[in-house]
């Protein structure tokens, strides 16, 4: 087996032999438990979190690999990462360290357009998609659409995602997921459109406010293929500033409620926050 070096990707640490190009949950478990050739590509990391180099993640909480590993991530730079933590923990790490504040805004945008807010995590031209909604118990498989070229649903019982070419020789991985949602194609199309709109807002904001031109990774991924988009109702805002103004009160209340929950015994905080909220709004809107 070998590893390839490609501009922008560095060393690809996943196995590249043809027999290791196709993956599913069943194949992943069987190979890790029985194929000694994979050992050199396996890493153990209970603190692993989703990142832009993650291709896909399979959840094994109900049937742990080797009796203890509850999640497996395919990472271009790290290789095949096994964790005793669930995919819930991997996703929570991303939420805490990368997109926690940003999630408030993008979820509000998603609600405006009628998108299921618990089906994916959108960053700037980076899209983590949950094969089953991650609300509730959070235990679900993930596919990272910014590395995906195309996908198809096979007989309504399996969805197969094909990656973009990852090196000059056309290295492609295929990830299969069982029991996809009946309307999976529509949901993904909505999220792709949502990502397109949100990323464009972000690009314009960075250009106008900071004079920065941010570039997208993987311009040949499905994120930039409008043929897959499912058009949503037009958003009611066309800039981050208008978005902030539109949702200011909601975000402020959410922030204050979070603080109050952290200090439950201090009931007087409810009164104090109510007072300061009114003052802040007066100052902001010159009331």
Regions found by a protein language model. Name each.
Residues 1-142, 151-287:
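Eukaryotic intrinsically disordered, low-complexity regulatory linkers and tails enriched in Ser/Thr/Pro
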């Amino acid at each position: 087996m070998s590893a390839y070096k490609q501009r922008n990707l560095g060393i690809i640490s996943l196995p590249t032999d043809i027999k290791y190009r196709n993956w599913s949950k069943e194949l992943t478990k069987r190979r890790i438990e029985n194929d000694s050739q994979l050992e050199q590509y396996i890493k153990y990391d209970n603190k692993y979190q989703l990142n832009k180099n993650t291709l896909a993640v399979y959840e094994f909480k109900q049937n742990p690999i080797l009796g203890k590993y509850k999640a497996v991530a395919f990472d271009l730079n790290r290789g095949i990462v096994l964790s005793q933590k669930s995919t819930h923990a991997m996703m929570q790490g991303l939420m805490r360290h990368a997109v926690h504040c940003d999630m408030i805004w993008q979820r509000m945008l998603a609600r405006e357009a009628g998108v299921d807010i618990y089906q994916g995590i959108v960053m700037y031209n980076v899209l983590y998609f949950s094969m089953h909604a991650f609300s509730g118990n959070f235990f679900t498989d993930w596919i990272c659409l910014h590395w995906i070229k195309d996908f198809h649903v096979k007989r309504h019982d399996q969805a197969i995602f094909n990656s973009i070419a990852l090196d000059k020789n056309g290295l492609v991985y295929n990830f299969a997921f069982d029991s996809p949602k009946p309307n999976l194609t529509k949901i993904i199309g909505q999220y792709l459109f949502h990502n397109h709109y949100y990323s464009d807002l972000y690009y314009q904001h960075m250009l106008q406010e900071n004079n920065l031109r941010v570039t997208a990774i993987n311009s040949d991924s499905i994120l930039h293929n409008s043929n897959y988009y499912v058009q949503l109702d037009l958003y009611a805002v066309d800039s981050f500033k208008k978005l902030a103004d539109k949702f200011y009160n909601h975000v402020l209340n959410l922030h204050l409620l979070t603080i109050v929950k952290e200090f439950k015994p201090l009931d007087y905080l409810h009164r104090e926050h109510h007072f300061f909220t009114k003052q802040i709004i007066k100052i902001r809107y010159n009331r």
